[in-house]
């Protein structure tokens, strides 16, 4: 194992990084420009990278989420873990030890400061980079990854401003490199089964969807020096909107063929009072603790409504503060029936195994028997063994590598990443303007009208 500190191979990118992390975030409430920007490259809809016999992987960030990816990649065939980068020695040591335990060659380690990742990007023996860092680093790291000739795979959300979204789209088109936001929920067994059912017309013509990220995470406020809560807590003091829209919205978007025959048109959003985090801090921390000095402005519950160009509606909710069970809603309503998640249930007028649509059908097994997605039929057992949010993480990474090794287009592209992530910014703009509607940028520049829907991908 080699420990290599910065060589600053991308000196010119320093100004870009600084601008993205500071100026763009503070400008997030500025008026949204909806006119498509002049295209400087070629559309990457359906982009197919040259086949790779072996996919050589670099990891930026191997903390909580990043280490999970390292674990999953160790179970995949046709990959080499070439390098890892992090600023915390403890998580580096953990990742290195795990890779050794799996009898894989030791990766080169990059550390030293926040820009050490550039040394990893300077290598010419890495094909893809997995980015699992605090949110404000996602956009600059993705851009620099593509500029260095590598494909970028980024944790959610992709970006934090409209301008960042455009910069990432433009870079992908100019470099002809993939930039996939790793929305793992799209690979859940239920979500892929519903996608299969939608494609087979079980629910009829689609009308409405409901998506959410309802996940009580106040406990993360106790992560002070390291881990997710050490930085994520502060976003509740900076922005009032839907901070984390993609887990629920990603699957619903694929059901509705967003960016592939339909697209988001406009959004309206409103937030409840921001009370829960201050109350939690008062209860769990000393009066003079920093957590009690913060002003929490993000509403405990944010609700946004999206209208698509075809007239469909989507409700999107965010709540990581109130005490209630986890949910992503995952509801899709069509002219013949509905699927709703948490708990899973179905009601259809025709083709419902004889059950009336006036009552929920909670017995999922017969639906799985008929509509289970081919990916889960093939690797479901392996996914359940290897874990990762019930197996969805493994299926996502397996599918990514399969596409790269077999010359297939990825299931999610940069336009999906930008469209799903930009809800973060647009919801804030709407909330701050008495819930007036905000228009979505068309990141595809009109190409959505002719793009083919995502099929029932196999393997």
Swiss-Prot record:
Keyword annotations: Glycosidase, Hydrolase, NAD, Signal
Co-factor remark: Binds 1 NAD(+) per subunit. The NAD(+) cannot dissociate.
Residues that bind NAD(+): 64-65, 86, 135-138, 155-156, 184, 244
A single GO molecular function term of this UniProt record: nucleotide binding
Pfam families: GFO_IDH_MocA (PF01408), Glyco_hydro_109_C (PF21252), TAT_signal (PF10518)
Coiled-coil blocks: none
InterPro entries for this protein: Gfo/Idh/MocA-like_OxRdtase_N, Gfo/Idh/MocA_oxidrdct_glycsds, Glyco_hydro_109_C, NAD(P)-bd_dom_sf, TAT_signal, TAT_signal_bac_arc
Binding site for substrate: 213, 232, 244-247, 326
Leader sequence residues: 1-31
EC identifiers of the protein: 3.2.1.-
Necessary cofactors: NAD(+)
Processing after translation: Predicted to be exported by the Tat system. The position of the signal peptide cleavage has not been experimentally proven.
Protein family: Belongs to the Gfo/Idh/MocA family. Glycosyl hydrolase 109 subfamily.
Function recorded in the entry: Glycosidase.
Protein name: Glycosyl hydrolase family 109 protein
Species in which this protein is naturally found: Shewanella sp. (strain W3-18-1)
Lineage: Bacteria, Pseudomonadati, Pseudomonadota, Gammaproteobacteria, Alteromonadales
């Amino acid at each position: 194992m080699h420990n290599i500190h910065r060589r600053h191979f991308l000196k010119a990118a320093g100004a870009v990084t600084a601008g993205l992390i500071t100026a763009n975030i503070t400008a997030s409430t500025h008026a949204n420009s909806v006119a498509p920007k002049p295209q400087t490259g070629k559309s990457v809809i359906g982009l197919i990278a040259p086949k790779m016999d072996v996919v050589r992987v670099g990891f930026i960030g191997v903390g909580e989420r990043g280490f999970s990816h390292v674990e999953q990649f160790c179970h995949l065939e046709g990959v080499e873990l070439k390098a890892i980068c992090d600023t915390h020695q403890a998580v580096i040591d953990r990742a290195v030890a795990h890779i050794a335990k799996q009898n894989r060659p030791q990766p080169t380690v990059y550390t030293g400061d926040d820009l050490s990742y550039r040394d990893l990007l300077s290598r010419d023996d890495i094909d893809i980079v997995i980015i699992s860092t605090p949110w404000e680093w996602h956009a600059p790291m993705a851009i620099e990854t593509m500029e260095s000739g590598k494909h970028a795979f980024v944790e959610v959300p992709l970006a934090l401003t409209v301008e960042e979204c455009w910069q990432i789209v433009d870079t992908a088109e100019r470099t002809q490199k993939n930039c996939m936001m790793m929305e793992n929920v799209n690979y859940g067994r239920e979500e892929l089964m519903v996608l299969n059912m939608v494609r087979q017309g079980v629910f009829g013509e689609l009308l409405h969807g409901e998506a959410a990220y309802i996940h009580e995470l106040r406990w993360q406020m106790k992560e002070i020096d390291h881990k997710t809560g050490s930085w994520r807590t502060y976003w509740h003091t900076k922005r009032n909107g839907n901070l984390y829209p993609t887990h629920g919205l990603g699957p619903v978007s694929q059901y509705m063929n967003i960016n592939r025959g339909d697209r988001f048109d406009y959004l309206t959003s409103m937030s409840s009072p921001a009370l829960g985090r201050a109350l939690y801090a008062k209860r769990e921390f000393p009066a003079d603790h920093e957590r009690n000095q913060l002003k929490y402005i993000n509403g405990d519950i944010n609700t946004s409504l999206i209208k698509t160009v075809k007239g469909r509606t989507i409700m999107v909710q965010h709540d990581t503060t109130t005490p209630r069970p986890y949910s992503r809603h995952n509801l899709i309503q069509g002219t013949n029936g509905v699927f709703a998640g948490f708990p899973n249930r179905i009601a259809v007028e025709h083709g419902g195994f004889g059950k009336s649509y006036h009552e929920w059908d909670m017995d999922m097994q017969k639906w799985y028997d008929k509509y289970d997605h081919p990916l889960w039929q093939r690797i479901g057992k392996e996914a359940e063994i290897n874990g990762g949010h019930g197996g969805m993480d493994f299926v996502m990474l397996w599918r990514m590598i399969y596409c790269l090794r077999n010359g297939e287009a990825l299931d999610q592209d940069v336009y999906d990443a930008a469209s799903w992530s930009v809800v973060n910014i647009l919801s804030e703009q709407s909330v701050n303007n008495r819930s007036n509607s905000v228009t979505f940028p068309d990141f595809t520049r009109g190409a959505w009208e002719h793009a083919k829907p995502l099929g029932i991908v196999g393997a």
